[in-house]
Amino acid sequence: MASTSTLLLPSLSSKNLHIAVPIRTNSFVRRTTKFSTKCSSNPESKDQFINLTPAPESINTTSAEKFPIEKRRRSEIIRDRTQRGIEKPEPPNFEIGWKRTKEINLEKPKGYVIMDFLEKFEALMAREFGSKELLAKAGEIVAERAREEAEVLRDEGKVEERMVTELFRVLKLMEMDLAMVKASVKDETLSQRIEQARARCRQAILVANSF
């Protein structure tokens, strides 16, 4: 056996034998995924962001003092606190029943004091009175007071002389009718004289109203 192995060695060495030994290699392949974003050149997307973003010059350019905010005055605030009652608002149409469209003259006439005396005395004659003498005396006092007031208005130049003279004439006629009331005996005559005196008193009221 040893001789045969020694014989084979030179023969093997003399021949060029190429023996391919398979080599087992473990190769690991790494798979990588690449993500790519494609930028489009569409101008509409840019315009959307431009519209949403405010301009730099429009930010913080108006001061707090110049900002257009209407401020309420202090007097108006106080006035709102006091008005807590229920008030009827003004109607849209002013030509309605409870609101007058014609202006009412509230100025009193010049002879309103004389008118007041005579109106009260005329109402007194329409009632039941104590006696005829007291009614005639009250008429004399009222007529004298009306004359004094008319003379004051005449001296101040507010009433003309002819109006004062007319008032004095009517008052004198009223005093004459009251004297007839005091002298009357029958009830029929008494009622007639009283009605005549009341008519003279109403006439004196109209004269005083025309001052």
From Swiss-Prot:
Entry-linked InterPro entries: Chloroplast_NDH_Assembly
Localization in the cell: Plastid, Chloroplast; Plastid, Chloroplast stroma
Gene Ontology, cellular component aspect: chloroplast; chloroplast stroma
Coiled coil residues, start to end: 136-163
Transit peptide: 1-38
The UniProt record lists the keyword Coiled coil: yes
Keywords: Chloroplast, Coiled coil, Plastid, Transit peptide
GO biological process: NADH dehydrogenase complex (plastoquinone) assembly
Gene disruption: observed consequences: Specifically defective in the accumulation of subcomplex A, a stroma-protruding arm of the chloroplast NADH dehydrogenase-like complex (NDH).
Subunit details: Biogenesis factor component of the plastidial NDH subcomplex A.
Function, as annotated: Required for both formation and activity of the chloroplast NAD(P)H dehydrogenase (NDH) complex of the photosynthetic electron transport chain. Functions in assembly or stabilization of the NDH complex; probably involved, together with NdhO and NdhH, in the formation of an NDH subcomplex A assembly intermediate (NAI500).
Protein name: Protein CHLORORESPIRATORY REDUCTION 41, chloroplastic
Gene source species: Arabidopsis thaliana
Source species taxonomy: Eukaryota, Viridiplantae, Streptophyta, Embryophyta, Tracheophyta
